[in-house]
């Protein structure tokens, strides 16, 4: 069956390239189909030396692994693979779990909590609203809306109590001011109570939820879809979409026959569907005398090497004609779709040790959990828990994928090493579903130790670790894709010293990691915080990529960080401070970072680099957070960073310029100014520590810092309050080497302690923020008016000297309390202002009517406050 004489020669006369390449590299480099010859010395079952092959296409196969069953549910015989598009039908049998755990039905959350099964399913749509209080000392409330859809799978995690609020409002003139500035009515009377609730994981939304016991609705330990499936006959695709594997089935009627079947499914046989798996295969046709033999090579296994025609390697067009000739012959004798739908035995050399996406390093062929361990080890080890096709019929079983044109980040072709395979995604019938595939290591490759998920995305550019499979966001880097299919390639093997620089540079591109699969520890942490995302671990300390940067010797004390929670109010969470693209950008004199600074020391700057950069360890110890700013380009400004709508909620909010109390010194100059060029300044500060008013919103820390003493005497301090957040990787700035500096003494507002003065040299962007037992901190910012500093010091009542500024609108709640104490008001009045959360912006809008009638103050107290607002200060 040689080609026609017009082609000029037969396959035996073709001059083959002396360089052979592995099949995975071949299909990623050249368009398919291609004619190839098995390299001499390669030993492949079913192939002879120097066999000619037509490499037809790459296919992504989705199959269900099944066992044959005897009476009594005993598993016998080898495993088989049934394609998801298998045309035969099956009938569900009584399941093992039905015997061990009979189906239960519930009519309320309280009934579910009493029985506390492992999981329940929602049998009808449920909507429930509850008003949640932020805390014992906080009168903010938030309406907690709960919506459950029919079929939602809920894994029970535990029980807790939430504070619910019963509010009956009073008419108050203060309400007008609160509404005017967008705040809730805090004058309303608030009654609180504790409500027991059931904490569950909703696998449709991938979120933990708190269901109050009062919530009514029908629940069951079996999915409503699965209960409907008990009757009738169903395709295998329908079964795996609507039931939870493993599941026992029988063959009720004679199944269709496929000429390529290697295992024959017969009427009356019983099977246990164990799990679902997806693998990428290269389908080929062996070209022999008057015979076409189809075969396939799974890319997760070791693949053979092939040689291409020399003309093809050189880019000539002649081999194209030869390829199309043989392709036409193959299509006459070979149906690739039928071949892809064949039932086959599972090969014994397939390693099933990998059951978690974190284990192993190849993803070409993947397994979901084994049948005998389907009881929950992790929340990730269930077909439905990984957002499979229950919620959108997205199974693909015979889709063609195109690996051609994929390059790695460095611009080189990315071959598939035999122990690193691409994470494939294929869109069949418009599907965007990517199977949650666990990894399997190739035969003969020793298993690698498990790597924490966060580290997978932190150390891609490090020479000490093998580059890992790309994130899904890199799919756009593939040059050409066929149809609606998509694919990703693994990065090439570890970089050599000559190419290390380029590799590290490419790794600095801020690519977000894919979403973290829900793990039991993370979910329990979520539930503990009532639907708050789990705080990423602080312990991830990546090694430095530059050996010339020594490790940091002094570490600042990092403040504790509290995750935003639905029980926090709209204002206390900081959400109201997010600005939009239309907002005015802040002036250069008001940096917007509120991080506890991580200082860049003189010995941490690479002298060869035009920019001083901190060491890797000196950067954030929480780089597992999606820090888009790390490694950003030099022309990116802080406004670009803060205004990007894709940023995580956990970054600081930027206050509008009308309320400058939210600004504070940034640890780095994002405008690129030389901060260290000026002479070092000498600054004195006082340490003090004491109690704060009951239930404060934050502990106010005042940082004394100025260019010189005379300038410091003429500047006012203004405190800002914002949630304590982890230090981020800063934009590199030009810096000059400075002598080793010591931590800057702090003055803690409202505290009593023996003051200690110290003199030290530092620049404006080098300081440590010390953290006590508070979750919120404030850093003083030099205010525009120096008038109040001309007044003599006076005690605030707690021992710390402080004078109010001339402009009161920017004061924090704590500073308003100090101001009232400064003018001699009683502690009960001050406590009332704290309870009502009166800050400077509210203080200047108070009227005599509000103070006397709503605040119930005496005439003298009202007069003092109004005169104080108008500029009066008591003389000492």
Swiss-Prot record:
On EGF stimulation, phosphorylated on Tyr-105 and Tyr-453. GO terms for molecular function: proline-rich region binding. Residues 811-876 form the SAM domain. Keywords: Mitogen, Phosphoprotein. Residues 560-572, 630-639, 647-657 have a biased composition (Polar residues). The keyword Signal does not apply. Residues 427-448, 460-501, 530-572, 630-664, 722-759 are annotated as: Disordered. The modification Phosphoserine is found at residues 609, 613. Residues 498-550 are annotated as: Necessary for interaction with GRB2. Acts as an adapter protein that plays a role in intracellular signaling cascades triggered either by the cell surface activated epidermal growth factor receptor and/or cytoplasmic protein tyrosine kinases. Promotes activation of the MAPK/ERK signaling pathway. Plays a role in the regulation of cell proliferation. This is GRB2-associated and regulator of MAPK protein. It comes from Mus musculus (Mouse).
